[in-house]
Amino acid sequence: MMHDDPNEAGLPPDDAALPDEAADGADEVNPLHHRRIRSFVTRAGRVSTGQRRAIDELGPRFVVPYAPTLPDWDAVFGRSAPRILEIGFGMGASTAEIAAHRPGDDFLGVEVHEPGVGALLKLIGEQGLTNIRIIQHDAVEVLEHMLAPESLDGVHIFFPDPWHKARHHKRRLIQPPLVAQLAARLKPGAYLHCATDWQNYAEQMLEVLSAEPTLENTAADYAPRPDYRPVTKFERRGLRLGHGVWDLVFRKRAA
């Protein structure tokens, strides 16, 4: 998920024991196995009254329950349109803004934390958005079971948890097995857009994405921020302090 607010990110203290630490050795053999090293830590988080109301009132329409089957996404969205997957939308502000400015595209947001789901649903209600659907589940399992090969027109992964301690780098979301899964689900010519404010993670992203043979970089290395990606409050504050932000935009090679 986006880590704009450390309290929402669910990140443990740097030296805290993590729930699946003991299983790390086995998971590294097959990173997409169901006991793999996860890129997130599930925390309860406080759901506000407004978020709870949005979940109760709008969830039945806009939240798609996870199931290990392929849905009819045209039926889910009520139309056939370009489909963009967003992994880890945080509190949903960027998702809602992008969807509002791109009404011809449909957006599927995947987020594990309930406050973020409630926050995005609240924005959907306030702005009258109809082109967003949400799955509250682990994105890797959603990719494996709910999205068909060559079914996506784009993927957004903005500011995933950086796991900045070296011993936790294996928990970072952008790893070769996940990128291969994402690439397989992109249509030829479709794009994968990642953004991070951690230089070390940006370098890892560039290395991993460049190594995926079915993807090609749209820039020499890092791309200018595309106009459709909003600058978040957290990002704006960081830029004022001289912190960097790195965007990477890759495309699926033609068959």
Curated annotation (Swiss-Prot):
Composition bias type Acidic residues, residue spans = 17-27
For this UniProt record, the keywords arranged alphabetically read as follows: Methyltransferase, S-adenosyl-L-methionine, Transferase, tRNA processing
- Lineage, top-rank taxon, reads Bacteria
Query: Catalyses which reaction?
Result: guanosine(46) in tRNA + S-adenosyl-L-methionine = N(7)-methylguanosine(46) in tRNA + S-adenosyl-L-homocysteine
Q: What class of enzyme is it?
A: transferase
Q: Name one GO cellular component term.
A: tRNA methyltransferase complex
Q: Catalytic site residues?
A: D161
> What is the name attached to this protein's record?
tRNA (guanine-N(7)-)-methyltransferase
Organism encoding this protein: Burkholderia vietnamiensis (strain G4 / LMG 22486) (Burkholderia cepacia (strain R1808))
